[in-house]
Amino acid sequence: MNKILLLLVVMLCSINSMAQSTDAMLFGDVKAKEGGRHLAHAVISIKGTNLKTQCDGTGHYKIGNLPVGKQTVVATLSGYQPQELEVEMVAGKGTEAYFELEKDPLELSQVVVTGTRTSHFVKDVPIRTEVLTSQAITKKNAQNLYEALEGVPGIRVEQQCQFCNFSEVRMQGLGAEHTQVLIDGEPVYSGLAGVYGLQQIGTNDIDRLEVVKGAGSALYGSSAVAGAINIISKEPTYEPSVTGDVQFGNYGFKSYKGSGSMRYNNIGLSVFAQRTEMKAIDETQDGLTRNEVKHKDGISDRVNETMNNLGFSLYFYQPFTKNDKLVIRGKAIDEQRFGGVMTNDQYLNPYTDGTENIKTNRLSGDLAYTLPIGAHSELNFATAYVYHKRQATNDTFLHDYMDSHKDPAHPDEDGAEPDVSIMRPYIAKENTVTPSLTFTSILGKHTLLTGVQGYFTRLRETGLYVISAEDEKTSPYYGVPYTSIGKKHANEIGFFIQDE
């Protein structure tokens, strides 16, 4: 293994040394076609290479050591259509290129990365991809990922339980286990986290959602057979910004949001915080017609929920060498939800029949590093760590205990209840690490991508149960409570190669 790593380092150093200094410089400015004002912070890139720069606050740019000969220069800026210009680069000389960008009302200039793990404009992406921008999410007033995905064509989000409101997302008619949820390209939402994850991921830090439908997203593994949903976090901009949002609604709904972003020279920082509160609702019951359904049945339709969501993103531009980038992120989620039988506020007591009380604590951190190598290659390393804890009480133990302690003379009546002092919640703790390494190289008309992805997880869970199976009725242990302790782990490593 050490020999392989050493060989990789030598190869990268060799490739980097091949990047010759041509001293060919390109400079100019970027303006809006309508009005002629300079556009700050537009991105200038050389097509077919990974060479790029960004305009300063006055809309001017310069970039040096470009390949000699005829080159295609592309100017991009969010909200504007990209523009391409052909220039002739000469060694030791400067060349000028001036851009005038038009507005892009359809946002076809959005750059997406999910489908092929490489950057494409939405209009050029080879895999069916939909983009839901932060502006669209704001217009929907979506408080979480579940609400943001509602109504997106080809996606079905649904709640499966009145007592706890656990949710799942389906694509292409397949089950939720075949849809992969990613955060900045990392598969950090496991089966444990995914049960309530759609409603726990706030929208305050989402720049866009990239939705890839179908098996074209197979680069992310077997969990993405139906498709993948990639949550792209916001990146700091040169214009300092501070936003706040407070909302109040019926049924005890309260929402507080705050965020800030700034970039100074080669360092950028963004922070966000979000708190959502809502009370339990009971407005419907089972039925086949509207008149049958629109009556209360005493069981929560929406659970009582309090969620706190906060995090930061720290960007270092060119920290070690020219055009490289280092990103460090941290996020935390704290949520409590409880629901079930609402008669006499029974759902407020976690240790009663017909109620559920779930508390979630989640801490995550990730690091991503991008290193351009020469003019046509790029190395990307990313890793994420997640600590996820869930503490839950439900009526499984209580129901089984009462069922196994019925009076034989009165089988239709509830059995004896256990001593509350022996009852314990279900507790699960999971630690997950997801490292990945990719190498991209442009060879003529081909873009070659190779990479390796790892997924390592450790899960420990404990719960209180009771022996209550029918075939155990003659056993002396029938009706006896016991504690179950489970330890599980998974180590997955995948290698992929792609030519496009």
Q: Residues of each region from the PLM?
A:
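Extracytoplasmic beta-strand/coil segments of soluble accessory domains associated
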Residues: 129, 146-187, 207-208
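Transmembrane beta-barrel wall of Gram-negative outer-membrane proteins
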Residues: 250-277, 289-336, 361-368, 372-374
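Short, acidic, small-residue-rich periplasmic hinge/interaction motif at the N-terminus
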Residues: 29-35, 42-47, 76-80, 90, ...
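Face-selective signature of the C-terminal outer-membrane beta-barrel domain
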Residues: 319-335, 358-500
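Hydrophobic, lipid-facing positions within transmembrane beta-strands of outer-membrane proteins
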Residues: 167, 227, 240-242, 254-258, ...
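Short acidic/polar hinge/loop motifs at secondary-structure boundaries
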Residues: 64-65, 168-170, 186-213
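Short, acidic Ser/Thr/Gly-rich low-complexity loop/linker segments typical of extracellular
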Residues: 49-60
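A beta-strand signature from Gram-negative outer-membrane beta-barrel systems
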Residues: 152, 200-243
